[in-house]
Amino acid sequence: MASTATQNASTRYSQIWIDQPASLPFQDSINLIKEDKEKWKKEKTAFLIDYDWFEGYVDFIYGEGDNPGPITQWRLLDEKNELKHSLEESIDYSIVSASLWHMLVEWFGLEGLAIERKVLLVGLAAEQKPFVDIYPINFTLHVLFDPINGENTSYSPLYQIDEPYHSDEPYAFSFSRSDTLRSLYKQVMEAFQISDGTSFRLWYLNKSNLSSRFVSLSEFNDQPAIALLSEYAVCMTIFEIDIADGSLLLEFQHPNGEWLSDSITKEQNLTINKEIGLCGLYNLGNSCYMNSALQCMIHTHELTKYFLSDSYEKDINYNNPLGMMGKVALSYASLLKMIHHTADMHSVSPSSFKFIIGEFNTYFSGYRQQDSQEFIAFFLDGLHEDLNRIQIKPYFERPDLFDEHPLHVQRVANQCWDIHTKRNDSIIVQLFQGMYKSTLECSICYQKSTAFDPFMYLTLPLPTSAKWRHKVVYVPPFGTQSPVELYLELLMESTVIQMKFQATEKLQKMGLECGELTACDIYRGKVYKVLKNKDKISKKIHKWDHVVLYGSTANGLTIPIVHGCKRPAMPGSYQSNDVFGFPLQLNVRSRNVLTNDLVKEIVELYRVYAGIDVAIGTLQLGLKRMESKAGKWECIKEIEVKRFEIVEEEEIVIDDKTVIMCLWNDQQYEKLFYNCEWIFEKIQFHMESITLEDCLLEFSKPEQLDLQDSWYCPGCKAFRPATKRLEIWRLPKILVIHLNRFSGHGGDLRRRRKRRDLVVYPVFDLNLKQFLSPFIKDHEWLSSQKSMLYDLYAVDNHHGFMSNGHYTAYARDASSQTFFKFDDTAICEIDPEDIVTSSAYVLFYRAKN
């Protein structure tokens, strides 16, 4: 179909116009316009009509305007009578059905050309949507030619055909986006009279400056963007391949089986052994969920090399009823090759790939945020079915197993895996698929039934009754004892009083008497809050909170000691000070204290607590009596904004409202405290609340099935309540772990709740041996494994809420072994220590062996 307007009106329509369409009543004309908005969508072709003229016609039949006169199309055409570029519907043109177009021309006449276009149906049969192919793809066709051996037999087909070949002008033609690559091959064969059986291939050049029909090898090599149109992709349409106007280069095979371009492409193909570069992906409207998943898949270098080396071509299963006609695999291969030939730190658009995915799953076809893990699951399954080497799946009876004799279990497991691989054989099975053991047990008679099922990824639950783990610091009331780090572990529903009780027990085992404890959350040198005994630790103590437990004694008076760095005082104002570090405490025996004695005790306190030797003459004290009725620790919540009076008296009076500040200048501050973790809050307080080990253990816990999921027990011969237990039986080379952070189901993402727990997972040496089913400890498959160790190489992260969140990815570059963060088009290096975050959603591990 040509890109020019297809009909000359003067040869088909009369140049007449009328005052009123006489062939239809007035109301029928209005109904005709309304019905036509849907009518053209059901036909094979439609016509473009000048928007202003058509609006004038609508006004005319409603009695709101004059007769529009003949249809004028000149505004849509250029000087070559071709459709102008960048025209827009409802601004420059309207779309009408063929029947309405012909009727309007008969009524009003036509000045200009009729512009007819194909109506394409995009998507699966049940979800197809009409799309008018306004701008067909225009190609120029060239022939790869060796000027040195121009007369040799490798190009004999070129010299056996008549025009249009003998002209030096490139052959120009247009193609509809709905036509397949097979149709394009056929049209090229017809244009050049190429006989069946002649081996040739087509190269696509996106940005071509070629003007001659013949293209030399050196010219071919100089082209900026070249892609081979694979004969394996003949089922895909031009729309799906996502190629635009450009040039096609025809290359014939030499009788000896060689291709002229191989002298160049062999050189280029060596780069396949080079790891794929760092390339960003453009966000196509909330497509970050896809981009993050793709970055993880792209950095699965075993799969990427499989595609870049074209090994996939021989495996494509076009006829698999469970597959996608090979299109998902072909589109992904095209995306990888585009990325592979893109310079590092640049970006590409995955638009064609996204369209193909949306064509087979409308859930991913729009511009709404979707679940990245669900995309990964669909994508892996689609790749597997497109690349399944089993053309006709044989039927097998599933073996039953009602006992747990180790030999029986192993025999049935082997049978199940053998059956699975006889029906499923693909690179996805080889890399990603493992198998788990599923055991049902009747709650009445305890009859068991065991089955073995393959998995592509493990969905791990986050324990609902996870342990609360935190590090706290105990500060004793006496200056003769150093602070102590305590590692506490309690149930999530525990309270602060229970936390104190566990801390007291640990201290007593160390031979330390702590008295009544005060629990404080310390932030930037002040008491941010004093924790109440009834407070739940999971709600009041957050992951990064610094919790300090202050001991007490019945003897004497204990006062807080805070640390301040002097700030220059403005004339006429009090000294202002910045507080830092953790408040300490000092026990004094008398309310009347000599300043010099107090300084000596504080100097000793610093030495014991922090290992700092301070010259007595360098320490300056500030004193403040708090007016608040609250306790002494509550009093220093706002300590950084209180003004302290410099102690100059020889003797001072201490009471339970007194707070002492030790004042340091900038030089002392840097010199004395730089390496002091107690003062500078360098202690790592947070401990993981959930580990990946916790999740794996939770995965294998027996689960009580709901009543609606009652199991038909072969022992009871009736439906019975049952428990179900899953155990890992066989591990894949690439282990994908989905951390199930979201609860709730259905399409409304706003109703899905997210857990933001930090799940701590190893970056190196994840050992899964302890999580395998105990029945395979002596199994030959296990003994054949060099190790059960896995290294992390990619993470799919979800930030924020499900309905308005954002996805990013961390991935390890295989050549440099460096981790990078991918945020759509933004790429930056990241330290391996920083990739364990509470945003981790899908983990990608690779077996070390």
From Swiss-Prot:
Enzyme class label: hydrolase
InterPro entries for the chain: DUSP-like_sf, Papain-like_cys_pep_sf, Pept_C19_DUSP, Peptidase_C19_UCH, Ub_carboxyl-term_hydrolase, USP_CS, USP_dom
Domain of life: Eukaryota
Stored SMART domains: DUSP
A GO molecular-function annotation: metal-dependent deubiquitinase activity
Pfam families according to UniProt: DUSP, UCH
Span of domain USP: 279-848
Enzyme Commission number(s): 3.4.19.12
Active site positions, chain numbering: 288 (nucleophile), 806 (proton acceptor)
Domain annotation DUSP: ranges: 20-120
Entry protein name: Probable ubiquitin carboxyl-terminal hydrolase 1
GO cellular component: endoplasmic reticulum
Keyword Magnesium in annotation: no
A single BP term in Gene Ontology: protein deubiquitination
